[in-house]
Amino acid sequence: MDAPDVVTLDGPLLVFGGPYGNLEATEALLAEARRRAIAPSQIVCTGDVVAYCADPQPVIDLVRDSGIRVVMGNCEESLAAQAADCGCGFAEDSACAVLSDQWYDYADRHVDAASRAWMGGLPRRLDLALGGRRLAVMHGGVDEISRFLFASDTAALDAELDAVGADGAIAGHCGLPFTRVIGGRLWHNAGVVGMPANDGTPRFWFSLLTPRPDGIRIEHHGLGYDHVTAARKMRERGLPEGYAAALETGLWPSCDVLTPAELPERGIRLEPGAVLWPTDGAAADGWPRAA
């Protein structure tokens, strides 16, 4: 993946991932940004605008009209190309792969040609200058758009940071929010808004990155929204019950993609927190834990 030109921002930067066709969650996120007086140019989405939920076209329209920055996820890549599957990277015949056949078929039938063209034109990488640091924004890994990278994957994250050609990376895809500072370099995942964080609550997650004299402060925030309506619409439209129930229970229907380190954290409530990525390169704790 070639490094693009750099967009300079003053901050704060609001980051979120995975709207997943969840209209109620996406509306709530954008309303929260307005409440905080964060301009669209200071908001970035890490991709997968469309996936599991009931309103693919309305969410695309909402995101496009909002004027925020978006990078291409695997779902955009697949829908733009009218591919046979979502390109999510699920193991063959896993529960996630079987369920994805159902929601991807629904999404593919409810996205118009103009939206496919828009998705196909999204950048795979966006580089931002914030607080004197260069941050590469992408969906999965540097060279693999659907690579699952979790907080416990220290060696894999370190290798990705070696390859990224920037001071840090902002990514998505795995569905869980976390921040790691490894050898003075940042790997940050804001989580997603279209599904809960597998913590037993229906909240979604987003983050704020704010430059300060001593570094960049990274805040993880959970937010409630009208998940009842979002789940009801999924059921009315015949989408997989496991994901509709997940919107209510806060628990994923399958944990196939999780590492052994992340599996025991299923159902453990996340609490908002913050990490300082220090200017001087000093060691920094991670969130939600120091891995």
How should these model regions be labeled?
Residues T154-V193:
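Anionic-ligand binding region
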Residues Y20-E24, A51-A54, C75-A81, I145, ...:
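Active-site environment of divalent metal-dependent phosphoester hydrolases
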Residues S66-D127, A151-G165:
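Active-site neighborhood of divalent metal-dependent phosphoester bond hydrolases
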Residues M1-S66:
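N-terminal active-site segment of His-dependent metallophosphoesterases
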Residues T8, V181-A291:
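Acidic, His/Gly-rich catalytic cores of divalent-metal-dependent hydrolytic chemistry
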Residues F16-G17, Q42-D48, R69-N74, M138, ...:
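Active-site neighborhood of phospho(di)ester-bond hydrolases with catalytic His/Asp-centered motifs
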Residues A25, V49-S66, A80-E92, F148, ...:
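Metal-dependent catalytic neighborhoods of phosphoester/phosphodiester hydrolases
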Residues P4-L14, L128-A136, I182-L186, G215-R217:
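Beta-strand-turn-beta hairpins that frame and shape the catalytic cleft
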